[in-house]
A protein has these predicted regions:
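An alpha-helical, amphipathic repeat domain used for nucleic-acid recognition
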Residues: 1-257
């Protein structure tokens, strides 16, 4: 599935990133132990381009290759041969390595299907990336237009009501399950159903369900239809109105109650 892009640009900018980060369990850095055996008084001895990828640099400290980072990160961090390898520098390089790995993982996920910011943060966290890096990458990709919570949410909303009717609350709940922020989920649900006659939509659905139960008594069929509508989030008044319309046109092939 291709990534959903909106020509107007990203709409959410990962507004759910803050709350999502708070819900993540722990801070599992993929590179936590990568510098454990490097003496703090060692210096950078080489920074070499990779033959397989000229945009990447291999960083050596002492006799050990310590990390492979992007050339842009080398410049941004001011890495140079002879620079002292300090704990602070090690942490910065570790963060750059993990950020690069997380970005690659995120792009791989987005190549398969679209995600909301919250979903992507959760997936990166489950793969072991720290919450801080996961949020940072999601925000970066949202700014670039590769994640768009509003476009993604609208696509889900259209798909949800394409074959079965749904109430506004049901639709908003489905969007929240896909980690769409609550205020955006409510707005999308409201706008999706703005021109929909919910009683008429529910009645058409009920008639299809009734036709699919030719050997079931009318009483049992009505009970099942009412339960199905309740599961789709319809309130008691809408269900009653739907069943009233249904009973106005009884089917002759239904068994007697």
């Amino acid at each position: 599935m291709t990534v959903i892009l909106d020509p107007r640009g990203p709409r959410s900018a990962c507004r759910a990133a803050g709350p999502a980060a708070a819900k993540l369990k722990g801070d599992h850095s993929t590179g936590q132990q990568m510098f454990a055996n490097i003496a703090p008084d060692t210096t950078i001895t080489a920074i070499e381009p990779l033959r397989s990828d000229p945009t990447m640099r291999r960083v050596r400290v002492g006799r050990k290759t310590i990390a492979t980072v992007q050339a842009a990160d080398v410049e941004a961090m001011g890495l140079a041969v002879g620079l002292d390898w300090t704990d602070q520098l090690a942490q910065r390089v570790q963060r750059a390595v993990e950020t690069h790995q997380a970005r690659g993982a995120a792009l791989g996920l987005l190549n398969r299907r679209a995600y909301s910011c919250g979903e992507l943060i959760d997936r990166l966290a489950r793969r072991g990336h720290s919450s801080q890096v996961a949020v940072s990458i999601a925000q970066e990709l949202a700014t670039a237009g590769l994640i768009d919570d509003e476009a993604y949410g609208r696509a889900i909303a259209r798909e949800t009501v394409a074959t079965k009717p749904a109430s506004q609350e049901f639709l908003a709940r489905k969007l929240r399950e896909r980690r769409i922020p609550d205020d955006l989920a409510q707005r999308i649900a409201c706008e999706t159903l703005a021109d929909v006659d919910l009683v008429e939509a529910a009645t058409q659905y009920a008639r299809k369900r009734l036709h699919a139960m030719p050997t079931v008594s009318r009483t049992t069929a009505t009970r099942r239809i009412a339960a199905a509508l309740a599961r789709r989030g319809f309130d008691a008044d809408t269900i009653a109105a739907t069943l009233g319309r249904l009973n106005q046109a009884p089917l002759t092939d239904q068994p007697a109650t």
